[in-house]
C-alpha cells in the first residue's frame, strides 16, 4: 500500500491539522516508509510465539489484602481548623 499526496491532505483535513504543501510532500515519503516497515513486519512468522507485553519477563508484585480501619482519623482531622467527632467543619456557603 502506498500513500499519495491527496491521501495525506485528506487525512490531515480529517484530523483537523493544518499541513502545507511542502509538509504534505515530506509526510508522503515518511508515511510510505512507515507502511513499508509494517509490511515487513507482516511477513514475519510468529506461529507458536506467545503474546507478550514486555521484552523483559516481569511478574506482578502481589501483597496480601489486609482489612484495616487505618486508625488515622485523629491524625487527619488534626490538620483541620475545625472538626467535631472526626468530621471536618466548614462554613456554610449555600442557603
Curated annotation (Swiss-Prot):
UniProt KW keywords: ATP-binding, Ligase, Nucleotide-binding, Protein biosynthesis
Broad class of enzyme this protein falls into: ligase
GO molecular function terms attached to this record: asparaginyl-tRNA synthase (glutamine-hydrolyzing) activity; ATP binding; glutaminyl-tRNA synthase (glutamine-hydrolyzing) activity
GO BP: glutaminyl-tRNAGln biosynthesis via transamidation; regulation of translational fidelity; translation
Pfam families according to UniProt: GatC (PF02686)
Described purpose of this protein according to its UniProt entry: Allows the formation of correctly charged Asn-tRNA(Asn) or Gln-tRNA(Gln) through the transamidation of misacylated Asp-tRNA(Asn) or Glu-tRNA(Gln) in organisms which lack either or both of asparaginyl-tRNA or glutaminyl-tRNA synthetases. The reaction takes place in the presence of glutamine and ATP through an activated phospho-Asp-tRNA(Asn) or phospho-Glu-tRNA(Gln).
Record text on subunit structure and interactions: Heterotrimer of A, B and C subunits.
Protein name: Glutamyl-tRNA(Gln) amidotransferase subunit C
Source organism: Rhizobium meliloti (strain 1021)
